[in-house]
């Protein structure tokens, strides 16, 4: 689950701020916290959280969303330090525009959203859930056993063109 929206910081309602941070940060915190005892017992514990390219960039009218994704990155980096001694790695994915439930309303509203992000992408398209799944599969694999505290950008080259 994830939420975007909230509007400009100046006019954002506190309830909108709280709701976005609750879904995007507090839920991630609670899930990570609940998993820690199990991960410590695992021979190869892995945490992979979902951030956003907004962890590096920012967008007007996206103050709560951008803040929430910075918090996910900070939490994940902290978990990498706290759990490393147990062999647990903690990383996060930084997706660009991916065709998901979050982007569905924008895609359904007309061609502008897809055209905007496709033009920004070096690959000329939006990402698919399988693109994120592949990145997650890599981070949970033994090939990534020495990667921790890292944000893996999966954005089709958007940040390279920015």
Show where each model-derived region lies.
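Short C-terminal tail/terminal secondary-structure segment
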Residues: 57, 137, 148-162
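Short, small/polar-rich loop/turn modules that mediate ligand/substrate recognition or access, typified
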Residues: 84, 89, 147-149
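Active-site helix of classical SDR
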Residues: 32, 68, 76
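Substrate-binding pocket helix/loop in short-chain dehydrogenase/reductase
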Residues: 8-9, 16-18, 113, 117
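Residue(s) in the substrate-gating loop at a strand-loop-helix junction
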Residues: 52
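Active-site loop-to-helix junction immediately N-terminal to the catalytic Tyr of the SDR YXXXK motif
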Residues: 12, 58-66, 78
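A conserved structural motif in NAD(P)-dependent oxidoreductases
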Residues: 121-132
């Amino acid at each position: 689950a994830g939420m975007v929206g909230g509007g400009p910081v100046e006019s954002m309602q506190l309830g909108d701020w709280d709701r976005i941070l609750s879904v995007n940060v507090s839920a991630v915190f609670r899930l990570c916290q609940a998993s820690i005892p199990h991960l410590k017992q695992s021979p190869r514990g892995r945490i992979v959280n979902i951030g956003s390219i907004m962890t590096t960039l920012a967008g007007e009218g996206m103050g709560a969303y951008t803040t929430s994704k910075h918090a996910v990155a900070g939490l994940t980096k902290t978990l990498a330090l706290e759990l490393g001694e147990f062999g647990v790695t903690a990383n996060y994915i930084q997706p660009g525009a991916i065709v998901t439930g979050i982007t569905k309303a924008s895609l359904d509203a007309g061609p502008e959203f897809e055209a905007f992000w496709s033009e920004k992408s070096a690959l000329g398209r939006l990402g698919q859930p399988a693109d994120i799944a592949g990145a997650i599969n890599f981070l949970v694999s033994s090939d990534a056993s020495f990667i921790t505290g890292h944000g893996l950008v999966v954005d089709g080259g958007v940040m390279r063109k920015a």
